Each structure stands twice: as structure tokens, then as C-alpha cells.
Design a protein with these regions (language model features):
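N-terminal Rossmann-like or analogous alpha/beta NTP/dinucleotide-binding catalytic cores
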Residues: 3-164, 235, 264-282
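Active-site cores that bind ATP or allylic diphosphates and position pyrophosphate for catalysis
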Residues: 138, 142, 146-299
Length: 299
């Protein structure tokens, strides 16, 4: 075990030589909010596409009411990790559209950075990369994350093999080829200039279930996550799942209302919150409002 721990520490240093802050630093920097006992902290976290689905609007309306009925906070966070979908002026559009419906934010994107209420920022994910890296480094140190060098072609080959065998597709168990690479092998490949993503070393089991209480639907049972999901892409930018878990935690979000399409992500989020040592916010999933909203119905 000692040797593993040493390897993990070395690996963390190899992957994140410039990360000098720890999760503890951020936990202190963003303490729990001093709010009345029943107050809820909610958020709207759209991608900056400049287009608001009805589903987003519906969730925002619910979130704003929940936050403001007991002296809570409703903030705007921008999920801009996907550069391809970014549209100039999108943030202003979002704020103006919501203002048209009398939905006002208390803090977040759209307020000046030095505004006193913006103590939990930055509120754009691209400006928070060093925070995600601190948590990623900590997961590597604890043996809960690892670099994966598999190419798109290799992943595609595995997927076809899984489909032929009629098993669940994805990167898990015996199909997770990079899961058990030695430190020396990893170092050799990085030195050779190979690029990699960072994956979660999932602790989930295919025959176990999680039980969680949905604020809207009540108790729900779902299979545990078993996938070694990607946490950081090749360019070091986090995936939506990883970023939002850290953001919801550090911004001290208590309640998330989102479209029913996100229900399938709960096992992933459940495991992420667990390995990161975070308390999960209360999730409420709404039924689909409209067919065309299914894809992105308000995250």
C-alpha cells in the first residue's frame, strides 16, 4: 500500500506540477453561506449559446422562487467549457430574457467581478480551471483518478466489441485499458508527447443500486455508476460533470431543479460528490415540457 501511495503522489506531481493549492484552500476561501436556516441557494447554469429553451426558463422560474421565498440566493453561472458552442453576447441575452420575465439574479455572471455579492466567483467555468485542477490532483493522490491515453479509434474499437458482445458500452472494468498502467509506463508515454484525458477510477459495482430522494419525484433507485468517466479533457478543461460538482459545492448550492433528461446522470453525480467528499445538493427533476427540449432541458 505504501508503494501505491508513493506512486500516486508522484503521479499527481507529474500530471499537475504547477498546482500548489489544495481543496482545503478552496473550502476555506468559499465557506458555507451565512443565511437564515430555511434559506436555499439555487442557480441557473446555462451554456452561453445565446438561446434559452423553455425548459431552462421553467427551471429558472422554479429556482428563483425557491431561493427568494426564504431569504436565499439565486445566482447565474456560465457553463462555458465547450468553446464550440459559445456565442458572443450570450450572457447579456440570458440576463435580459430572464429580466423580461421578472426573474432577477442576486449574484454571478453579469455583475462586476468586484461586486460585494460576488464572493463565490468566478462564475465562468473557463476562469475556474485552476480550482478544478486542485481537486483533480487530490483525486490522483488518493488513487481515484488516472490518465488515459486511449485514442478515439481505440475507444471506438472497444465500443464495437461491446456492442457485438451485447454488453454495456463505455470505459469500465476490463475495458478500461489504462486503468492499471504503472507510474513508469505513464511517465514514458507523457515524455514521448502522448496526450491524455484524466478519468475517474470508479468504485461502482454493476450489481449495486443507489437510492436517492428526488425533490419532485420522491425516492428513486438507480444502478451505481461503473464508468471511469472523463474528468479533464486533453486540453485540461473539465467535463461538465466534474466542473458542475465542484461549482455546486463551492458556491454552496443547496437545491437544483433541472429537466428530466438529467435523471440518467444522477449515478455519475452521486459518485463524484461522494469521492470528492461533498454533500450532494437536493435534486428535483421535472418532466419534459416539450419534445424539442429533451436534449438540453435546463441543466
Amino acid at each position: 500500500i505504501m508503494e501505491d501511495e508513493m506512486d500516486n503522489a508522484q503521479l499527481a506531481q507529474l500530471l499537475f506540477p504547477d498546482v500548489d493549492k489544495t481543496p482545503e484552500y478552496y473550502e476555506e476561501k468559499f465557506p458555507y453561506r451565512k443565511l437564515p436556516s430555511k434559506a436555499q441557494v439555487t442557480r441557473m447554469a446555462p451554456s452561453p449559446t445565446g438561446f434559452i429553451h423553455l425548459g431552462n426558463l421553467y427551471s429558472a422560474l422554479a429556482d428563483e422562487r425557491i431561493a427568494h421565498r426564504n431569504g436565499g440566493v439565486f445566482y447565474l453561472r456560465i457553463e462555458d467549457t465547450d468553446e464550440k458552442r459559445k456565442v458572443d453576447g450570450a450572457v447579456e441575452t440570458i440576463i435580459n430574457v430572464l429580466r423580461y420575465f421578472d426573474i432577477e439574479f442576486d449574484e454571478g455572471a453579469g455583475f462586476p467581478d468586484d461586486a460585494p455579492q460576488n464572493a463565490y466567483g468566478p462564475y465562468f467555468q473557463r476562469q475556474r480551471v485552476e480550482i478544478y485542477h486542485a481537486y483533480a490532483k487530490s483525486l490522483v493522490e488518493r488513487g481515484l483518478a488516472y490518465p488515459c491515453f486511449c485514442t478515439e479509434e481505440e475507444l471506438e474499437k472497444v465500443r464495437l466489441e461491446q456492442e457485438a458482445d451485447k454488453v454495456l458500452t463505455g470505459y469500465y472494468g476490463k475495458y478500461a485499458h489504462c486503468r492499471d498502467l504503472s507510474f513508469d509506463e505513464i511517465k514514458r508515454r507523457i515524455d514521448a508527447g502522448e496526450t491524455y484525458v484524466l478519468r475517474l477510477r470508479s468504485q461502482g459495482s454493476p450489481d449495486k443500486e443507489i437510492t436517492f430522494v428526488d425533490s419532485i419525484m420522491g425516492e428513486i433507485k438507480l444502478p451505481e455508476n461503473i464508468h471511469d468517466i472523463v474528468l479533464l479533457k486533453r486540453d485540461g478543461v473539465p467535463t461538465y460533470h466534474f466542473a458542475h460538482a465542484i461549482d455546486d459545492h463551492l458556491m454552496r448550492t443547496t437545491t437544483v431543479i433541472r429537466g428530466g433528461g438529467w435523471l440518467a446522470s444522477v449515478p455519475t453525480h452521486y459518485e463524484l460528490f461522494h469521492v470528492l467528499g461533498f454533500k450532494m445538493p437536493a435534486y428535483g427533476h421535472t418532466a419534459h415540457l416539450m419534445k424539442f427540449d429533451e436534449e438540453t432541458g435546463g441543466k
